[in-house]
Amino acid sequence: MQSVSQVVKTSLPNYLSSLPVPDTFGGWFKLSFKDWLALIPPTAVVVGIGYVTYRAFYPKAHRTCKSGSGLCNENVRKHEAKVVDMIDIENIADKAAFCRCWKTKNWPYCDGSHAAHNKDTGDNVGPIVIKKK
């Protein structure tokens, strides 16, 4: 414990006070190459702590697919500006499941592709099921 106390009370303050931090903004332009090299280690430590903190508190809701594109629709009718399907309810036999994850190969009907999508992204999307009464 004494070694930790020595580092915190003596070594670290001595190291920080010996760093060539200028008093004015213009002083940054007068630093030599050796002074800039001396500032790299503490800057790297501060950046590393900032990055680790950012990753620790980064919301899990912002995860994207393995492809990393962030798009919902990656392959269904990309030549159209907006994908819209009109389905007459009278044409549905008993019930129909419609895709909401855009991963199906049988568009607009669900083929269960959302299971892999949910596993990859942590999402919980499922189909829209329409039944006849």
Swiss-Prot record:
UniProt keyword annotation of Iron present: yes
Tree of life domain: Eukaryota
Names of required cofactors: [2Fe-2S] cluster
Residues noted as binding [2Fe-2S] cluster in the record, renumbered to the chain: 99, 101, 110, 114
Topology, Cytoplasmic side: 59-133
Keyword Iron-sulfur (UniProt): yes
InterPro entries noted in UniProt: CISD1/2, FeS-contain_CDGSH-typ, FeS-contain_mitoNEET_N, MitoNEET_CISD
Segments traversing the membrane: 36-58
Gene Ontology CC terms, in alphabetical order: endoplasmic reticulum membrane; mitochondrial outer membrane
Any GO MF annotation of the entry: 2 iron, 2 sulfur cluster binding
Compartment(s): Endoplasmic reticulum membrane
Cofactor note: Binds 1 [2Fe-2S] cluster.
Pfam families (alphabetical): MitoNEET_N, zf-CDGSH
Membrane topology of the entry: Single-pass membrane protein
UniProt-listed PANTHER family: CDGSH IRON-SULFUR DOMAIN-CONTAINING PROTEIN 1
Protein family per UniProt: Belongs to the CISD protein family. CISD2 subfamily.
Protein name per its UniProtKB record: CDGSH iron-sulfur domain-containing protein 2 homolog
Organism (species): Drosophila virilis
Gene coding for it: Cisd2
